[in-house]
Amino acid sequence: MIELRDLTKNYGTTRAVDSLSCTIEPGVVTGFLGPNGAGKTTTMRMILGLDHPTSGSATIDGRTYRQLTDPLRSVGALLDARQVHPNRSVRNHLRWMAATNRIPRRRVDEVLEMVGISSVAGVRAGTLSLGMSQRLGIAAALLGDPPVLLFDEPVNGLDPEGIHWVRTLMRTLAGEGRTVFVSSHLLSEMSNTADRLVVIGRGRLIASTTVGEFVSRCGAATVRVRSPHLEQLRAVLVDAGLTVDTTPDALTVHDTSTDAVGELAARHSLALHELSSQEVSLEQAYLSSTDDATVYRGSAG
């Protein structure tokens, strides 16, 4: 379990993380979302003792990282896959980590097999592609078989098969009762992987909840309907007090259900060619909830 209590980090006059409090529970995959500059990496660095909080605390099973007697056996992390000695082989990089943390050498070959890079074990780490470097970083995180795992953008550089593999791995690790805390900018992938979300903006907590609750809270489903009598149907729906958006071939009806729209159409003998519920996606909910917290915004034109 990871607990953040009023976690705050200032860099000069800039507040990167602002009184952040939440709990990352074991047994589920918790996604960590926020716009660029929101404070995600800084938060992870404070959890791992790489940055000191200005105030507040970040603890792993009740202890700060610096209080852990066997850190690699307590928490594993992937923050930057390129942080390796470029001239060491893949296997020797992991053997060095194992030796300095009193981890049996046999564990090195186990994690190499687990992440699918046994075939490049003798290759210099500095020559690996980004995708292979990510796999090596994940292997390093798993080396101590820790109960708590943090991954910062673990699917960067991975092909579709690799992304699917990471998704399966995260869910397997959580299913074993571990705490899995993972950040990603690929929201479609996060919606397939995460059980819970921690969402921040400008260093402040926006939400700490399940994926389903977050999506439901940040946007209601709409109903899409097509009919050969579109104008008449629109008038019926508006007269019923519903909010309706019109496109050339369909209507989008807000804050209602397919049952309600279907009953109104039937009552007025209006044929329907399509009647479907359009669920809010995680991406739509995320953009809605973080719109005011975006630090870096590009121009559309």
Predicted regions and their residues:
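Conserved NTP-handling cores and scaffolds of large molecular machines
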Residues: 101, 218, 241, 279, ...
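ABC transporter nucleotide-binding domains
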Residues: 2-4, 9-182, 187-201
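ABC transporter nucleotide-binding domain
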Residues: 166-252
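C-terminal coupling/interaction segments
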Residues: 256-301
